[in-house]
Amino acid sequence: MRKIYVTGLGVISGIGKGVEENLDSLKAGKHGMGKITLFPTALDVPVSEVKQSNEELKKLLSLPSGKTYSRTALLGLLAAQEAARDAELDFTSPRIGLISSTSIGGMDASERFYASFREDNRKGRLRDIISHDCGASTEMIAAYLGVKGTVTTLSTACSSAANAIMLGARLIRHGLLDAVLVGGTDALCRFTLNGFNSLMILDKEHCRPFDRTRAGLNLGEGAGYLVLQSEKSLIKAPYCELSGYANANEAYHQTGSSPDGDGPFLSMSQAIASAGLTAGAIDYINVHGTGTPSNDASEGKAIRRIFDTRIPPFSSVKAFIGHTLGASEGIEAVYSVLSIRHGLIYPSLNFHLSDEESGLIPETIFRSGLPIRHVLSNSFGFGGNNSSLVFSTLNR
């Protein structure tokens, strides 16, 4: 079976622009939570916003100011550009592809169009909402980087980026491509904020994944991309190997997590097996850990079923960056690769009391200099779409 290597990383989130800024914030325990400033809203809940405005993002990308870009596309362009530059590849080759994901697409641009149209129907221009479709941001990234190979968009809610990474790996393993830029992007918008509020799972305080008092999630925005390559196409030393992956569709509920953790159990156990490992080989778990009562309970039960009493160190970065929906595993895959690269375990912020049922206690302090060989990273979406990835050191 062909090995899949990670050779490029790119990320933007509420804790930084670029890989180095994100890593510095994780090391310092610096979260990105604050009040909503991107748009007016009656909701008083913390979110993790990317600090740059749309115009600032356009300038960073040297884009024309007169053209309409959704914020989702701008965030994706910046992270994808960083990953592409890091990999040092010619992305115009037909053997290089792009698999990008998003949950809400260009909804933020559509909301701006709707507001101006309601104010004066002569102001609304239909060409301003061409970025509404989920595939629009992917097409913009492909055009910006000159990608001529396979270009595909995935949207499976919060597991989107994990599934994009898996599809990219499969295309390489089957010999269809030599390299693929994979990941996801999502921006904050009213649709997302009001939608999660209607589900009554937004915490009015900073989220507390796996804590007994957890009361919901905090939303965030950002983008994360990786470049995956086959061994024969390598031109630089890779960061690590994408050694395993799996997706399990339990279809328990449209928005809720299965109480017995069947979906997470299947995706985690199958990803570990796909990597040719046993549960005892996992050194760190980047859990999905949104901070909602049902998600953390479900994921906790699955972890107990797989690892029993030998639970490896685990943590959630959602209290740093919020839940970035379709971008979450793109961003967190970058963090997982950095964990292996530098021997790091990130803290779960705001954790104080262990859950009475699971008894699980995540890592609460930043740890470095550790022999991290295998990282399991989880990403679970609405509709029971559960995905897990395993990243491994080069000499395993």
Predicted regions and their residues:
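Active-site-proximal gating segment of KS-fold condensing enzymes and close homologs
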Residues: 102-152, 295-309
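Active-site-proximal alpha-helical scaffold in enzymes
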Residues: 76-88, 134, 142-145, 151-183, ...
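Conserved active-site "lid/cap" helical segment
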Residues: 15, 20-21, 25-100, 106-107, ...
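Acyl-CoA/ACP chain-elongation machinery
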Residues: 176-198, 203-214, 245-259, 287-296, ...
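Active-site pocket-shaping loop/turn-to-helix segments
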Residues: 14, 61-81, 125-133, 151-163, ...
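Conserved small-residue
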Residues: 8, 26, 80, 98, ...
